[in-house]
Amino acid sequence: MEGNLEVRQHLNQALKLQLTAINQYFLHARMCKNWGLNALNQYEYKVSIKAMKQADSLIERVLFLEGLPNLQNLEKLLIGETVPEILGNDLTMNQGIRDGLVNSIAFFETQRDYVSRDVLSEILEETEEQIDWLESQQWLISNSGLENYLQSMMGEE
């Protein structure tokens, strides 16, 4: 089924953000693993895998609409060098993803493309959950102290 060019462009933009998220979360996971922060490693790794599955659903939708998924285009990775930077950069990235998803979902409504809207709505729901989790982690650091937070992240998730 041939789809609207603008719809495919919006889907490719969402794909670009998910591909960036895969890489950023995966690198952050492995950095946390290297530091012995097993629980944080597991969380970041799981989110990286979720982003990969979300990218897969976007790729399938672009192909269904007879477009070509762009897997070569990425945003700049926001790599943290400390745990607070990692959490802050992941939050910044997710807020950008959320803004892009909300914009694209509104566009799909105007085009009456409810399937593409639903694909992005599922991603939006998970993105908002990640934003909430990241904000909670920042709250924990500010209220319990970085040392206590890091100690809590050394165990298994």
Swiss-Prot record:
One of its GO terms (biological process) is intracellular iron ion homeostasis. The keyword Iron applies. Heme b binds at residue 52. Keywords: Cytoplasm, Heme, Iron, Iron storage, Metal-binding. Disruption phenotype: No visible growth phenotype in iron-sufficient conditions (30 uM Fe(NO(3)3)), in low iron conditions (no more than 36 nM) cells grow at half the rate of wild-type. A double bfrA-bfrB deletion grows as well as the single gene deletions. Even in iron-sufficient media both single and double gene deletions have lower photosystem I content (PSI, which contains 12 Fe atoms), store about 50% wild-type levels of iron, and undergo iron-stress. It holds the Pfam family Ferritin. The keyword Metal-binding applies. GO terms for cellular component: cytosol. It is found in: Cytoplasm. Part of the iron-storage bacterioferritin (BFR) complex which stores about 50% of intracellular iron. Missing most of the residues required for di-iron cluster formation, it probably does not have ferroxidase activity. Belongs to the bacterioferritin family. NCBIfam families: bfr. The bacterioferritin (BFR) complex is formed of 24 subunits (BfrA and BfrB) of unknown stoichiometry. The BFR is arranged as 12 dimers that are packed together to form an approximately spherical molecule with a central cavity, in which large amounts of iron can be deposited. This is Bacterioferritin BfrB. It comes from Synechocystis sp. (strain ATCC 27184 / PCC 6803 / Kazusa).
